[in-house]
């Protein structure tokens, strides 16, 4: 009976440690070192391409690029769609 109890407690401890390590790894992968929250957090590849392509087409000589309104909380900035 003691062996069973020890085995159950050991498995529980391993599970807790594994879960904690997995959460820490996930958090470290989400955070960029030295990058403030106000900077670009995420870029959607499709919207980035659409916005850059649209800005290049609309550019006329020395005039600045006309900003295409990106949808869904995105805006066009420096020929890229950035999350607002």
UniProtKB/Swiss-Prot annotation:
Disulfide bonds join 51-65, 55-76, 70-81. Expressed by the venom gland. It comes from the Eukaryota. Residues 23-48 form a propeptide. The keyword Disulfide bond applies. GO terms for molecular function: toxin activity. Transmembrane segments: none annotated. GO terms for cellular component: extracellular region; host cell postsynaptic membrane. InterPro entries: Hwtx-2-like (IPR012625). Residues 1-22 form the signal peptide. Its main location: secreted. It is found in: Secreted. Keywords: Disulfide bond, Neurotoxin, Postsynaptic neurotoxin, Secreted, Signal, Toxin. Belongs to the neurotoxin 12 (Hwtx-2) family. 02 (Hwtx-2) subfamily. Blocks neuromuscular transmission. Acts cooperatively to potentiate the activity of huwentoxin-I. Paralyzes locusts and kills mice following intracerebroventricular injection. This is U1-theraphotoxin-Hs1a.
């Amino acid at each position: 009976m003691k062996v069973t109890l020890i085995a159950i407690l050991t498995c529980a401890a391993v599970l807790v440690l594994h879960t904690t390590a997995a959460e820490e790894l996930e958090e470290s992968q989400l955070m960029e070192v030295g990058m403030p929250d106000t900077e670009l957090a995420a870029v959607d590849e499709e919207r980035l391409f659409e916005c850059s392509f649209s800005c290049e087409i609309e550019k006329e000589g020395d005039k600045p690029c006309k900003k295409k309104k990106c949808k869904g909380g995105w805006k066009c900035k420096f020929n890229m769609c950035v999350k607002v």
